[in-house]
Amino acid sequence: MQKEPMSQFGYDKLAAELKDLKDNQRPAVVIEIDTARSHGDLKENAEYHAAREKQALIESRIAELSDLLARAQVIDPSSYEHDSVKFGSSVVIMDLDTEKESKYTLVGICEGNLDKGYISIASPIAKAMLGKKEGDDFKVRLPKGESEFEILSINYEPLKF
């Protein structure tokens, strides 16, 4: 079973979503199904079929979240050195073709937020950076083609969700 690294915030966010699905959304959709069923012929009852589809989506998400939380590995990135790129590292990189600098922080798969520079540890660029040190170059295949980057700095900055 592959562990999924995430911060305590990410774990709590997923756990809250799972609790809401189980405690609120699942019972509500059961009521919707019962109400729609009381309207008669199920073959031509669009309300009933929509509620059943909604129920399937909720059950699917519950299964997905349950699996993810079972595999969660909560990591406190402040507890270790950031001498190489790891989960929780803030990394400044430079595109060697354009000399454009970008800063990214590696976070769990459910915590990505590109506006804040938070990228999933499962993203192609994060995977290519893992284990690298300052001054190292790495290549990554992006939608626009292969690009080469240099790691300018690595440090830890507390996450601000």
UniProtKB/Swiss-Prot annotation:
Coiled-coil residues: 45-73
Extent of the signal sequence: none
Gene Ontology terms describing biological process: DNA-templated transcription elongation; regulation of DNA-templated transcription elongation
Keyword Protease: no
Origin: domain of life: Bacteria
One protein family per Pfam: GreA_GreB
GO MF assignments: DNA binding; RNA polymerase binding
Disulphide bridges, residue numbers: none
Keywords assigned by UniProt, alphabetized: Coiled coil, DNA-binding, Transcription, Transcription regulation
Function summary: Necessary for efficient RNA polymerase transcription elongation past template-encoded arresting sites. The arresting sites in DNA have the property of trapping a certain fraction of elongating RNA polymerases that pass through, resulting in locked ternary complexes. Cleavage of the nascent transcript by cleavage factors such as GreA or GreB allows the resumption of elongation from the new 3'terminus. GreA releases sequences of 2 to 3 nucleotides.
Listed NCBIfam families: greA (TIGR01462), PRK00226.1-2 (NF001261), PRK00226.1-4 (NF001263)
Family: Belongs to the GreA/GreB family.
HAMAP family membership: GreA_GreB (MF_00105)
Name the record gives this protein: Transcription elongation factor GreA
Species per Swiss-Prot/TrEMBL record: Campylobacter jejuni subsp. jejuni serotype O:2 (strain ATCC 700819 / NCTC 11168)
Gene that encodes it: greA
